[in-house]
Amino acid sequence: MNKKTLKDIDVKGKVVFCRVDFNVPMKDGEVTDDTRIRAALPTIKHLADQGAKVLLASHLGRPKGEVVEELRLTPVAARLGELLGKEVKKADEAYGDAVKAQISEMKDGDVLVLENVRFYPGEEKNDPELAKAFAELADVYVNDAFGAAHRAHASTAGIAEHLPAVAGFLMEKELDVLGKAVSNPDRPFTAIIGGAKVKDKIGVIESLLDKVDNLIIGGGLAYTFVKALGYEVGKSLLEEDKIELAKSFMDRAKEKGVNFYMPEDVLVADDFSNDANVKIVPISEIPSDLEAIDIGTKTRETYADVIKNSKLVVWNGPMGVFEIDLFAQGTKAVAEALAEAKDTYSVIGGGDSAAAVEKFGLADKMSHISTGGGASLEFMEGKELPGVAALNDK
């Protein structure tokens, strides 16, 4: 990686503004899943141990530039304190004189969580004045929020113009793992692309067709490809305006010698619930009054075989509606194949795929689970991420 990291700077006695991704699920004022907080611990501990005064900035939810009481970061600061085993203070603002006064009382190694940066309308607009106000608090900027790296916001991009700016450990690991997958993958290299819509994955499919040996398609977006082969898809998800594009993707795969895998059979249902009547049919026989909601048993076996014979697998998007147990078997089969594959390095591209491996209790069997859904997709597409571009070069 050609960006400066924590290893390139001395932070002793300095105030460090560290952008983290604490956008965690909450219920009744409690953090229900602290995965993202735990992911930032190595960077936070390193900064504190090295004698920095650590300011932590994050967004939470979508307050749209105004104060929303239930989106304050107070419960997050409390949970972080439990994980660190020490007191973590919380500011009521993210910049300004009151925050500066709190910072002046900090000792080396202390941690202060700033208020939700999205309470300020300037954050998402990358307002230069707000970026400057953030920068005035600190001596050094560290970005450890890979999950927000594809956004050019005041706390992810603008602030870096005013301070020495380096990547935290989590950001560094994400860029190293995904960077190797994109530029120098172990082969056979397989990408699994699922999810609901073709339109959300156009860029990543286009980019991966130049890099992979095998491309596996699943989820709702698969039925546009099924239709492109000339089959009827019943009531399944279908993007009529993307059928020609699906055809061109299949043609390009053939030209490039990429093995293109799509469902051979599917699970069809008469309802979107655990009580639905279901059956498995070949893709050539999807009934007109039913909807395909998951991949079938034959397809699961084929996909599992491809996975187990791959050296590197990148997975982005589920095979079916895994939130409903009846329609979770395809996604589970992929997760289990990855968990069982001995010589396969598995990269889970955040978002729904990460939620799925968590749900099936297989997260610890994956080589790398990305903390950024949108960011990892854009990185795989070959786009420059503003939060990374803003950091100092080595």
Curated annotation (Swiss-Prot):
**InterPro entries the UniProt entry points to:** Phosphoglycerate_kinase, Phosphoglycerate_kinase_CS, Phosphoglycerate_kinase_N, Phosphoglycerate_kinase_sf
Instruction: Please list the residues that bind substrate.
Output: D21, F22, N23, R36, H59, L60, G61, R62, R118, R151
Q: What is this protein called?
A: Phosphoglycerate kinase
Compartment annotation: Cytoplasm
Q: Which GO cellular component terms, listed alphabetically, does the Swiss-Prot or TrEMBL entry include?
A: cytosol
Q: Which UniProt keywords apply?
A: ATP-binding, Cytoplasm, Glycolysis, Kinase, Nucleotide-binding, Phosphoprotein, Transferase
Gene Ontology molecular function, alphabetical: ADP binding; ATP binding; phosphoglycerate kinase activity
Q: Give the PANTHER family listed for this entry.
A: PHOSPHOGLYCERATE KINASE, PHOSPHOGLYCERATE KINASE 1, CHLOROPLASTIC-RELATED
* Coiled-coil residue spans: none
* Binding site residues for ATP: K201, E323, G350, G351, D352, S353
As its record notes, the protein acts as a catalyst of:
(2R)-3-phosphoglycerate + ATP = (2R)-3-phospho-glyceroyl phosphate + ADP
* Subunit details: Monomer.
What CDD domains does UniProt report for this protein, alphabetically?
Answer: Phosphoglycerate_kinase
* Pathway involvement of the protein, from the record: Carbohydrate degradation; glycolysis; pyruvate from D-glyceraldehyde 3-phosphate: step 2/5
**Pfam families, per the entry:** PGK
Instruction: Provide the positions where the record notes the PTM Phosphoserine.
Output: S183
- The lineage's top-level taxon is Bacteria
| Similarity remark | Belongs to the phosphoglycerate kinase family.
Among the GO biological process terms of this entry, one is: gluconeogenesis
Q: Which organism is it from?
A: Bacillus subtilis (strain 168)
Instruction: List modified residues, type Phosphothreonine.
Output: T299
Q: Which SUPFAM superfamilies match?
A: Phosphoglycerate kinase (SSF53748)
Record EC number: 2.7.2.3
